[in-house]
Amino acid sequence: MRLRHKPYAMDRINEYSHIVIGNPEERAGNWKEVFGNEQPIHIEVGTGRGRFMYDMAKANPHINYIGIEKFTSVVVDALDKLIEEELPNLKLINKDAEDLTVFFAKGEIDRVYLNFSDPWPKKRHTKRRLTYKTFLRNYEEVLVEGGEIHFKTDNQGLFEYSLMSMAEYGMLLTYLSLDLHNSDFEGNIMTEYEEKFSSKGHRIYRVEAKYRTEPMQ
């Protein structure tokens, strides 16, 4: 998908620097001070236009959320939503998630969401998938002990790869759905892509995976 250039994007992001946090590496270890409370912190890697994070933050005021999106022309759409109705428990980061361990201290995050990530279907691009072992290691580094990843996609190939990658990493798969919208799962909050794909009849896959607190036997 080609992203439309928005020349005003950086000016708007700079104007609302209390929402889109600049220099997040300077906040590592101090994100609870940014929010001004001791609530748990959940992050979404690849937050896109922010609907999921916005709806989650609105539904769960007792949890703090951070949406991470590297494309400026996309994250500004998420910002616009927050300008209309600011939520004190939602912040944004306009950076590449490859630097996750620089943005957060060890054990600072309670949960990671991955929603409809780029599948990078070509084999030579495997390392770019957000469930590749390098990314799994980064998530583990910033998550609390026994922290979780919640992952959704409509791409069967990426889902199967992700299950294998998580299992090989030694994670515990605590929830699995091969057809989320026809399951008994309650409280699902949709992303923009999820609504679009499911309306076309695409099956939505979901997995919740937990890092082990003890080595595998």
Curated annotation (Swiss-Prot):
<feature type="binding site">
    <location>
        <position position="96"/>
    </location>
    <ligand>
        <name>S-adenosyl-L-methionine</name>
    </ligand>
</feature>
<dbReference type="InterPro" id="IPR003358">
    <property type="entry name" value="tRNA_(Gua-N-7)_MeTrfase_Trmb"/>
</dbReference>
<dbReference type="InterPro" id="IPR055361">
    <property type="entry name" value="tRNA_methyltr_TrmB_bact"/>
</dbReference>
<comment type="similarity">
    <text>Belongs to the class I-like SAM-binding methyltransferase superfamily. TrmB family.</text>
</comment>
<feature type="active site">
    <location>
        <position position="118"/>
    </location>
</feature>
<protein>
    <recommendedName>
        <fullName>tRNA (guanine-N(7)-)-methyltransferase</fullName>
        <ecNumber>2.1.1.33</ecNumber>
    </recommendedName>
</protein>
<feature type="binding site">
    <location>
        <position position="44"/>
    </location>
    <ligand>
        <name>S-adenosyl-L-methionine</name>
    </ligand>
</feature>
<keyword id="KW-0808">Transferase</keyword>
<feature type="binding site">
    <location>
        <position position="154"/>
    </location>
    <ligand>
        <name>substrate</name>
    </ligand>
</feature>
<feature type="binding site">
    <location>
        <position position="122"/>
    </location>
    <ligand>
        <name>substrate</name>
    </ligand>
</feature>
<feature type="binding site">
    <location>
        <position position="118"/>
    </location>
    <ligand>
        <name>S-adenosyl-L-methionine</name>
    </ligand>
</feature>
<dbReference type="InterPro" id="IPR029063">
    <property type="entry name" value="SAM-dependent_MTases_sf"/>
</dbReference>
<dbReference type="Pfam" id="PF02390">
    <property type="entry name" value="Methyltransf_4"/>
</dbReference>
<dbReference type="GO" id="GO:0008176">
    <property type="term" value="F:tRNA (guanine(46)-N7)-methyltransferase activity"/>
</dbReference>
<feature type="binding site">
    <location>
        <position position="69"/>
    </location>
    <ligand>
        <name>S-adenosyl-L-methionine</name>
    </ligand>
</feature>
<keyword id="KW-0949">S-adenosyl-L-methionine</keyword>
<comment type="function">
    <text>Catalyzes the formation of N(7)-methylguanine at position 46 (m7G46) in tRNA.</text>
</comment>
<comment type="pathway">
    <text>tRNA modification; N(7)-methylguanine-tRNA biosynthesis.</text>
</comment>
<dbReference type="GO" id="GO:0043527">
    <property type="term" value="C:tRNA methyltransferase complex"/>
</dbReference>
<keyword id="KW-0819">tRNA processing</keyword>
<keyword id="KW-0489">Methyltransferase</keyword>
<feature type="binding site">
    <location>
        <begin position="191"/>
        <end position="194"/>
    </location>
    <ligand>
        <name>substrate</name>
    </ligand>
</feature>
